[in-house]
Amino acid sequence: MSKWSSTEWKALCSGEACPICLSGKPFGIVAELNATYLTSSPNSPMRGYCCLVLKRHAVELYDLSADEACLLMRDLQRVSKIVQEITGAVKLNYEIHGNTIPHLHLHLFPRYKGDPFEDGSINTKVTRQSPYGDKEFESFRRTLQARLSED
C-alpha cells in the first residue's frame, strides 16, 4: 500500500514485520476464542465496537483452510450475537480491511438509531472521543467476557 515501501509491505504480509505477530498478541484482548482473539478498547469508534484478530498470521480469507475459515466464522457469529444482545444495536456492520496492518482481522460496528453515522459508513477518523461514560467500557468488557464464558 502507499504508506509502505514494497519491501516493508512484503515483510508485513509475510508476518516478519507484522506488529501483531511481533508482540505475540493484539492489544486490548477481551477473550481468546477458537480461531481469534476478541479485542476492544474504551477509545473505540462506537459503543460496543469489537475486533476479531486471527491467532495466526494470514492476510486474506483465502489463506485459511476450510476448517480455519469455519472456526473464524463461528467466532464471528458467536461474538456478533452476544454484542447485539448486550448493546441493543439495531444492526451490526462487519468490515475486513488489512491495508494498514495486513494481519487478518474483522471489525464489528454496532449501529444505533441516531448514531453519528446513521446514513452511511462509520468514519473512524472523525470519531476520536470515547463513546463510553465513566466505567461503561469496563462494564461492557466484563459482561462480554461473562456471556462468552456461558457458552
Residue ranges and their predicted role:
Residues 1-151:
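HIT superfamily nucleotide-processing domains
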